[in-house]
């Protein structure tokens, strides 16, 4: 009787392990896809930021254009 219980428990553990391995592989594929998508989005954001900076003049004057502060 003890052997049947041990065999059933072992079979259950092997089954769970197989499902866990499948789940881990699926999660790995998902994480890898998300990392690639995030890298693309970072590049896209960087390009948009550069375009925005290039297209809008800055409201802050450069130090050469600033008038010197009054001296007291």
From Swiss-Prot:
InterPro entries, alphabetized:
SlyX (IPR007236)
Composition bias type Polar residues, residue spans:
55-65
| Pfam families in the cross-refs | SlyX
| Disordered: annotated span | 52-72
User: Gene3D superfamilies from the entry?
Assistant: 1.20.5.300
| Protein family | Belongs to the SlyX family.
Q: Which PANTHER family match?
A: PROTEIN SLYX
Q: Which NCBIfam families match?
A: PRK02793.1 (NF002750)
Q: What is the recorded name of this protein?
A: Protein SlyX
Q: What is the lineage of its organism?
A: Bacteria, Pseudomonadati, Pseudomonadota, Gammaproteobacteria, Enterobacterales
Task: Name the gene.
Answer: slyX
